[in-house]
């Protein structure tokens, strides 16, 4: 049973998936920091000095009555809040992550299309007399025994060997 688990765990797909999850988590952390620490502060300044992480609505006051200066104060007082500013931060983070994944998938699909675009040369051709498929290098059709046009001289093939 341990051997079967080892084979399963070391399969390419499982290892690739694990690496993808780890890298995805790290990328998510970077995007969240980018949004909360780099993008939202200037956006807050443009909208009149608003800190989006402190945008909330008090649904029920806590032990100490409001108004509360910040979300942290409302939480410390035990107030029930609707934190729409944090939701806006998460929405911006999601949009950036989704767009990044879209660009990545689009690039991978383009690479796959290039690989699929180069088809292998045909291995068979059609006899013009009886329309039977014959090997590309055949000089005569096996069905109707007609000599095929464009075929190499059979004697030349033997002499070349």
UniProtKB/Swiss-Prot annotation:
InterPro entries the UniProt entry points to: Mechanosensitive_channel_CS, MS_channel, MSC/AndL, MscL_channel
SUPFAM superfamilies the record matches: Gated mechanosensitive channel (SSF81330)
Keywords: Cell inner membrane, Cell membrane, Ion channel, Ion transport, Membrane, Transmembrane, Transmembrane helix, Transport
TM helices/strands, residue ranges: 14-34, 85-105
CC annotations in GO: plasma membrane
Membrane topology annotation: Multi-pass membrane protein
Localization (cell): Cell inner membrane
Family note: Belongs to the MscL family.
NCBIfam families registered for this protein in UniProt: mscL, PRK00567.1-4
Function: Channel that opens in response to stretch forces in the membrane lipid bilayer. May participate in the regulation of osmotic pressure changes within the cell.
PANTHER family on file: LARGE-CONDUCTANCE MECHANOSENSITIVE CHANNEL (PTHR30266:SF2), MECHANOSENSITIVE CHANNEL MSCL (PTHR30266)
Assembly behavior: Homopentamer.
UniProt-recorded name of the protein: Large-conductance mechanosensitive channel
